[in-house]
């Protein structure tokens, strides 16, 4: 069966043929490849073609596909049972690893997805602050819960407008949109809505408008504004946690949030996420407090075991993040040089093992900047790279990832492919 035939079959039974929209390649044209298996830095489709994988399951696989230690931990856990819906030792072990690593994590709670983590963090923040208003930022993605599926109105201080069908306007009326990397837009919302804002949520390193890091001074201003107006500051580190560094985004700004969300890497490739923070906030959760949150598979032993194996490897690894950042920078420097040779404008960003690139001559600091990127050119580049065995995120507004099994030779292979791709694009127009 070919990729095309398999995708056609999938569309008969799965809505859109995929279980997450970006996988359909709608942003870049063409049709997706259908994956058969992965090993290390590479994936293989059902036609037997090999690709250097810079998606790595959208971030979780920092040690690549089929890591032996994580695989062993999962197999041993499966032998004991898939799920119990009851407390186990492994969930406490993983919770302890996380709480001991981050000084602002007094307690945490596990869930099964990043969407659940951010949704639950917002709920407990509102329960603690006794205020319903939430500030989020244009271009920041925090999962697909209704209150967060919004776009900006006529200005940063307006109510959000539902940007997905099926989301009632009443659900998003307490969500306010601010401009990323613009503290003045946040202060204006606080000032014009006295006593209403209970929480601010932000990706300190945005990953779904492409990779766009928040400025240190901007995040410090957010901390000060939340303190001044009595709002809970939530850092969404579902993507950046254990990806930007061993301590997530913290080394880049130094601020301590009231709540933090995690996902992806902490599950070692399995379905695990978490939210946690100050004791007085987390104690608002049921059964100790009045804020309800629950989940059948939350803290399931398979995901917890995979997470323990992944974080234990991280803790035992020397120079892991230095290696990964060097690879990511080598890749982006190579892409930029190749683009320059073809007289194509390209902006790049790197944070640890995360990278992003934009087809625009201007620096990208916020969502409006990101939208100026040439998505038509991106689509051509993506197709040209896929043809050459390099699997990049099929959207201008996603982040790429390197992994530990990758070598400089792998990066150079991708850079050479980019050089050929840019020449092809320039030649064909």
From Swiss-Prot:
GO terms for cellular component: cytoplasm. Pathway: Porphyrin-containing compound metabolism; protoporphyrin-IX biosynthesis; 5-aminolevulinate from L-glutamyl-tRNA(Glu): step 2/2. It is found in: Cytoplasm. Its EC number is 5.4.3.8. Its cofactor is pyridoxal 5'-phosphate. Belongs to the class-III pyridoxal-phosphate-dependent aminotransferase family. HemL subfamily. It comes from the Bacteria. SUPFAM superfamilies: PLP-dependent transferases. Homodimer. Keywords: Cytoplasm, Isomerase, Porphyrin biosynthesis, Pyridoxal phosphate. It catalyses: (S)-4-amino-5-oxopentanoate = 5-aminolevulinate. This is Glutamate-1-semialdehyde 2,1-aminomutase. The modification N6-(pyridoxal phosphate)lysine is found at residue 264. It holds the Pfam family Aminotran_3. Its main location: cytoplasm. It is an enzyme of class 5 (isomerase). The keyword Ribonucleoprotein does not apply. GO terms for biological process: protoporphyrinogen IX biosynthetic process. It comes from Campylobacter curvus (strain 525.92). InterPro entries: 4pyrrol_synth_GluAld_NH2Trfase, Aminotrans_3, Aminotrans_3_PPA_site, PyrdxlP-dep_Trfase, PyrdxlP-dep_Trfase_major, PyrdxlP-dep_Trfase_small. The keyword Methyltransferase does not apply. GO terms for molecular function: glutamate-1-semialdehyde 2,1-aminomutase activity; pyridoxal phosphate binding; transaminase activity.
């Amino acid at each position: 069966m070919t990729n095309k035939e398999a995708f056609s079959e999938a569309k008969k039974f799965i809505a859109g043929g995929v279980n997450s929209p970006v996988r359909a390649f709608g942003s870049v044209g063409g049709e997706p490849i259908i994956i058969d298996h992965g090993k290390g830095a590479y994936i293989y489709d059902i036609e037997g073609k090999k690709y250097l994988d810079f998606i790595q399951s959208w971030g979780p696989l920092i040690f690549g596909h089929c890591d032996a230690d994580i695989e062993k931990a999962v197999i041993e856990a499966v032998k004991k049972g898939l799920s119990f819906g009851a407390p186990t030792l492994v969930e406490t072990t993983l919770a302890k690893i996380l709480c001991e690593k981050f000084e602002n994590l007094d307690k945490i709670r596990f869930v099964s997805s990043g969407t659940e983590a951010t949704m639950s963090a917002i709920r407990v923040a509102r329960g603690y602050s006794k205020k319903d208003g939430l500030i989020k930022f244009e271009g920041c993605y925090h999962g697909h819960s209704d209150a967060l599926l919004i776009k900006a109105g006529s200005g940063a201080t307006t109510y959000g407008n539902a940007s997905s069908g099926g989301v009632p306007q009443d659900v998003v009326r307490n969500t306010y949109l601010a401009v990323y990397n613009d503290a003045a837009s946040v202060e204006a919302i606080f000032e014009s809505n006295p006593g209403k804002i209970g929480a601010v949520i932000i990706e300190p390193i945005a990953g779904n408008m492409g990779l766009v890091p928040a400025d240190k001074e901007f995040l410090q201003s957010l901390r000060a504004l939340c303190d001044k107006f009595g709002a809970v500051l939530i850092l969404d580190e579902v993507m950046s946690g254990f990806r930007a560094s061993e301590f997530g985004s913290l080394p880049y700004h130094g601020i301590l949030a009231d709540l933090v969300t995690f996902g992806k890497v902490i599950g070692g490739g399995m379905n695990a996420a978490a939210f946690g923070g100050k004791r007085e906030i987390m104690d608002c959760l049921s059964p100790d407090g009045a804020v309800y949150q629950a989940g059948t598979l939350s803290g399931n032993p398979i995901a917890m075991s995979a997470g323990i194996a992944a974080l234990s490897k991280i803790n035992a690894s020397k120079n892991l993040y230095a290696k990964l950042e060097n690879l990511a920078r080598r890749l982006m420097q190579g892409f930029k040089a190749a683009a320059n040779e073809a007289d194509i404008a390209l902006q790049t960003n790197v944070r640890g093992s995360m990278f992003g690139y934009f087809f625009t001559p201007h620096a990208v600091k916020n969502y409006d900047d990101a939208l100026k990127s040439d998505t038509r050119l991106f689509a051509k580049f993506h197709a040209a790279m896929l043809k050459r065995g390099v699997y990049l995120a099929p959207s201008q507004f996603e982040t790429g990832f390197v992994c530990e099994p990758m070598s400089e030779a792998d990066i150079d292979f991708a850079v050479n492919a980019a050089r050929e791709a840019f020449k092809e694009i320039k030649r064909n127009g």
